[in-house]
Amino acid sequence: MSVASFLTGEKLLAGSKFVIGKYNVTIEKYIAEGGFSHVYLVQTNSKTDGSPITAVLKRMYSPDENALRFVKTEIETMELLKSNPHVVSYIDSCIFPLEKAGVNTGFEILLLMEYCAGGGLIDFMNQRLQTRLSEHEVLKIISDIVQGVASLHYLRPPLIHRDLKVENVLLSFNTFKLCDFGSVTEPMHAAENSSEIQALEKSINTFTTYQYRAPEMINLYSGLGIDEKSDMWALGVLLYKLCYYTTPFETQGPNAILTASYSFPPFPPYSHSLKNVIIALLQPNPCLRPNIFQLMCEICRLRGTALPFRDIYSGRESSFYDLHNRKIMSLLRQTTTTPFAGNQVMPTPQVQGSRPPPPPPMPAPIYNVPNVPTVPTVSPNPFLQPTFSGTSQASAHPSIHSQSATFNNTQDVNRQSVSSPKVVSSSSVTGSGASGRKVYTPQSKNPFPISQGVTGTSSKFSASEVTEDNGSPNAGLDADNVDVEEVVNQRYPDLNELESQLTSHTNITTSSHHNPREQEIAKLADDAFASFRQTAGTSTANSTHTTGTQDISAFDTNFSEGVGSVRSSFDFPDRPVSRRPSSTSRSSVKITGPSSPNARSMAYEQHSFNLDDLSNTNFGSNNSLRHAKSFSKYYSPSHKDSNKTSRNTSKEGLPSSPTMLYRTTSNTRGDYIVQRTQQSANPLTNIEPQDMSNLSTDINASDVVADSTNSILYPTSTASSVANTIASDVDDFGTFNGLQRTVSLHSERASLDKKRPSFHDKNPYFKFSPSKYVDEGLEGESELRERVRSYANRSSSSFHNPDLTDTEIQETSFNNDLRPVASIQSAETSRSVSDRPANFPEELNDTLFEQKYPGIVDYEEPNSNAEKNVNI
């Protein structure tokens, strides 16, 4: 084969035969081509046993030895990862030199690999062009891809793919596999001079795709190395494209990538949990992006599956939400700090109004790891080189404050710009201790304080240090074969180190002279830390955790009952609520309703009950901690139009309310049954619905209408969330990383007026600490209790609904058996509705009645002299 025929696109004919290693190959058909490669479907027969195999032949061309080196890297990488089920399997390969007139003109490489009958991921996405991918499918695809990327990141030294995109993912028997390892390389240090920058820029332009490049690949003067976190950014872009069939920066320039300026389209709708993963991955600061294990933890939590591999990043938490909090606080620091001179030391900030720093994390235990030689410590920052060693690792960390002082103010609260490196300090950073002091000399300036000790050619590990029993390099994901765990504190900042950046801030709520940017930043900072406190369900002795079960987050829980369920967790401190499984925790409250044929035939999905005066409740000192923007209306697109979706049910005798509070179903008798499902572990999101079956008075539809201002509040999702069959009610509740990005500061939340908080708004900025709530209760609780008691103790004369006319309600009274009966008369029909069947024998006592008809309570005469016991 000549070079000219290869470069002019001449393809191999069907039936052509080759010998590649130990396989006889016959060309069947041409599949696709790349820049310097052709792909064919072939049939192979092993020379040893003659077994036929359908495979793929990738025919590549390299003009010189330097280009051949990258092809060999691809072959060696595939051979190293051939046991991973989420990587396209390597079969065999061979290299032929090409000559013309006795002169070497390049090399031809034949790579034989696994055939994926499902085609490419891009073909699978095109088949769903109209309906798009469901959230379950998106999580399945990204889970397989992450496991393939983890096989690279878990090698020692780690490898980065550099060209992660949907075009490099194939489908084989319901498994998505990673392919095209021609861009694989080891982590690279930041370029320090113009020649290195030019060489790095050429390499990036050759081996990466522009829309998937991380900010550190765009701004080569930022002083940031290119490592595994660059792959994490590409995974965020890939995940975004799986959801919305476009990249987040498709129509924007490089500045959009540098500042992570993008938005989420309204269609298709996905849960906030999935959007949070995208937001965490697309962070301009590599420190704030999760590592591959943290990403896998979040995906497994959303899917409800077990982790497929262990955590080698010792000393770090699996949740990256706390790291995202640091970004919010760094934005706050930009407006509260002033620039420092080059030789001036930044004072240590005093944190006020926030939680104290957590204790230092304990090192993760290492099980079944043999004794290994001690690995010499290296500098925690690749851009600061030690002159000699001798201090502890804790004292080796340079000051993080001076490094982060070069952050630039941006025009958007959800953006961080990558600036050119600036001189922070001309003095050296020294460690502590009288002897064995380690002195660091700044080599290059980094606007993001990423501590990375394993970059380029690894200073900690070599390929020979971690091997299999047969002498081959270890693939990295087998827990039993990991001999050395990485000390991640040498590579990335510790959580305590990041939290030390927090600066003091005052109560912005009572100040009116702050500009809109400061108000928005303060609100985000307050809400981020107030929303993620320890939940009440896990902070008490009653909390349990079963090994092997899904860890349900109190702020993002997918209930098995799905959309249409009533979520309840308003547990008053003095009355413990028993936690039962969802199959047994269902209770119903019978409400006698309108008896018209329309009412019986209609499928009432929602009823509107409102508690207007609940918003007038004084919430005490917690109210002063909230910014004015925290009182805004629905912040997410799935809730902002709930006022427009309210069903007008006034013609059926039910009030029209702007808030959809809970859903009911109608049985054959025309009764509306309010169903409760399993209680949520989060007391912030919902109020515990009252068990109306324990009240000492029955409730009918007219009473609810008459006393709508004293009704109990049942939060639920809106009609727009019902349309999304993927996202549950809890997924619609936004966490702090659910703050959706916009292209300008003038977001939808900034334009809303201040309003009092209410539970049914499902306000994501509701700021009561779960632990404080359980210990002290909620202010205004006594008023709620008294209101329920007064409702239960009303006399029969108070059962009158002023909203219904005399022609609609003829009378409301109690019969001799003290059974509430509401006679509702209309032009169409008139019938009497009772809570007991019409043929119920009167000689049966209450006990037999309750046994035969569970859930229907026979009420007794209200006694004004006796105190009513009402369970709240």
Curated annotation (Swiss-Prot):
Bias-annotated ranges (Pro residues): 355-364
Any Gene Ontology CC annotation: cytosol
Entry keywords, A to Z: ATP-binding, Cytoplasm, Kinase, Nucleotide-binding, Phosphoprotein, Serine/threonine-protein kinase, Transferase
Membrane-spanning parts: none
Kinase in keyword set: yes
Positions annotated to bind ATP: I31, A32, E33, G34, G35, F36, S37, H38, V39, K58
E.C. number(s) listed in UniProt: 2.7.11.1
Region (Disordered): 339-479, 565-600, 633-664
In-chain residues carrying the UniProt-annotated modification Phosphoserine: S472, S596, S657
Localization: Cytoplasm
Catalytic reaction equation(s): L-seryl-[protein] + ATP = O-phospho-L-seryl-[protein] + ADP + H(+); L-threonyl-[protein] + ATP = O-phospho-L-threonyl-[protein] + ADP + H(+)
GO terms, biological process: actin cortical patch assembly; actin filament organization; regulation of clathrin-dependent endocytosis; signaling
Active-site residues, as the UniProt record annotates them: D163 (proton acceptor)
Recorded family membership: Belongs to the protein kinase superfamily. Ser/Thr protein kinase family.
Protein name: Serine/threonine-protein kinase ppk29
Lineage of the species this protein comes from: Eukaryota, Fungi, Dikarya, Ascomycota, Taphrinomycotina
